[in-house]
Amino acid sequence: MKFYLVLAFLTLCAVAVTALPAGDETRIDLETLEEDLRLVDGAQVTGELKRDKRVTCNIGEWVCVAHCNSKSKKSGYCSRGVCYCTN
């Protein structure tokens, strides 16, 4: 029992030592990341953004039924890729 306690303590110490900051290298990476993020502008985003209401119908109708059952509904059906729950 004492062996496992010492082993757990040594593992904890090893994890703590390896989790220490690396130094200036990480700060430089963060500075370049901030510069890259400043370069991105909302106007630069091209294309139309599309949000799927439910991905469950793309997988299968039984997933839609399971989703509706988990919401305490009687059943559910898919229409044009959207899951509708019925009472």
Curated annotation (Swiss-Prot):
Disulfide bonds: C57-C78, C64-C83, C68-C85
Entry keyword Nucleus: no
Propeptide stretches in the record: 20-44
Induction description: By bacterial infection.
GO biological process: antibacterial humoral response; defense response to Gram-negative bacterium; defense response to Gram-positive bacterium; innate immune response
Gene3D superfamilies: Knottin, scorpion toxin-like
InterPro entries attached to this UniProt entry: Defensin_invertebrate/fungal, Scorpion_toxin-like_sf
Signal peptide start and end residues: 1-19
Tissue: Hemolymph and fat body.
Alphabetical UniProt keywords: Antibiotic, Antimicrobial, Defensin, Disulfide bond, Immunity, Innate immunity, Secreted, Signal
Pfam families attached to this UniProt entry: Defensin_2
Family, similarity comment: Belongs to the invertebrate defensin family. Type 1 subfamily.
Name of the featured protein: Defensin-A
Lineage: Eukaryota, Metazoa, Ecdysozoa, Arthropoda, Hexapoda
